[in-house]
């Protein structure tokens, strides 16, 4: 039987992987993927704790996070496509050109 501690350890590992990806990558798509890993780690934690406490609030909150993440990715990928068409790169350092 997998205990709550195993799920929470998985959450911490996934959260660290996502945080490492955000801090170390300079590609905009990799930043989006790392953000999704962070959000999925949090979702696993909410569902695991909700299941452990026999409460549906964890699952409901995880569904809201999934919906918000989907809208974030939809808007973000649209902006990335426009950015790539204009600059022909997905490197985050090119965002410094936006200084007004």
Swiss-Prot record:
<dbReference type="GO" id="GO:0048038">
    <property type="term" value="F:quinone binding"/>
</dbReference>
<keyword id="KW-1278">Translocase</keyword>
<dbReference type="Pfam" id="PF00420">
    <property type="entry name" value="Oxidored_q2"/>
</dbReference>
<comment type="function">
    <text>NDH-1 shuttles electrons from NADH, via FMN and iron-sulfur (Fe-S) centers, to quinones in the respiratory chain. The immediate electron acceptor for the enzyme in this species is believed to be ubiquinone. Couples the redox reaction to proton translocation (for every two electrons transferred, four hydrogen ions are translocated across the cytoplasmic membrane), and thus conserves the redox energy in a proton gradient.</text>
</comment>
<dbReference type="InterPro" id="IPR039428">
    <property type="entry name" value="NUOK/Mnh_C1-like"/>
</dbReference>
<dbReference type="InterPro" id="IPR001133">
    <property type="entry name" value="NADH_UbQ_OxRdtase_chain4L/K"/>
</dbReference>
<feature type="transmembrane region" description="Helical">
    <location>
        <begin position="28"/>
        <end position="48"/>
    </location>
</feature>
<keyword id="KW-0472">Membrane</keyword>
<comment type="similarity">
    <text>Belongs to the complex I subunit 4L family.</text>
</comment>
<keyword id="KW-0520">NAD</keyword>
<keyword id="KW-1133">Transmembrane helix</keyword>
<dbReference type="GO" id="GO:0005886">
    <property type="term" value="C:plasma membrane"/>
</dbReference>
<feature type="transmembrane region" description="Helical">
    <location>
        <begin position="2"/>
        <end position="22"/>
    </location>
</feature>
<dbReference type="GO" id="GO:0050136">
    <property type="term" value="F:NADH:ubiquinone reductase (non-electrogenic) activity"/>
</dbReference>
<dbReference type="GO" id="GO:0042773">
    <property type="term" value="P:ATP synthesis coupled electron transport"/>
</dbReference>
<keyword id="KW-0997">Cell inner membrane</keyword>
<protein>
    <recommendedName>
        <fullName>NADH-quinone oxidoreductase subunit K</fullName>
        <ecNumber>7.1.1.-</ecNumber>
    </recommendedName>
</protein>
<keyword id="KW-0830">Ubiquinone</keyword>
<keyword id="KW-0874">Quinone</keyword>
<comment type="subunit">
    <text>NDH-1 is composed of 14 different subunits. Subunits NuoA, H, J, K, L, M, N constitute the membrane sector of the complex.</text>
</comment>
<dbReference type="GO" id="GO:0030964">
    <property type="term" value="C:NADH dehydrogenase complex"/>
</dbReference>
<feature type="transmembrane region" description="Helical">
    <location>
        <begin position="63"/>
        <end position="83"/>
    </location>
</feature>
<keyword id="KW-0812">Transmembrane</keyword>
<keyword id="KW-1003">Cell membrane</keyword>
<keyword id="KW-0813">Transport</keyword>
């Amino acid at each position: 039987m997998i205990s709550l501690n195993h799920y929470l350890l998985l959450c911490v590992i996934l959260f660290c992987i996502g945080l490492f990806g955000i801090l170390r990558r300079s590609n905009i798509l990799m930043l989006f993927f790392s953000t999704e890993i962070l959000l999925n780690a949090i979702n696993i934690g909410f569902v695991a704790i909700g299941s452990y406490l026999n409460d549906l609030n964890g699952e409901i909150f995880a569904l809201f996070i999934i919906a918000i993440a989907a809208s974030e990715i939809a808007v973000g990928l649209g902006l990335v496509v426009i950015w790539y068409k204009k600059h022909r790169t997905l490197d985050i350092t090119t965002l410094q050109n936006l200084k007004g």
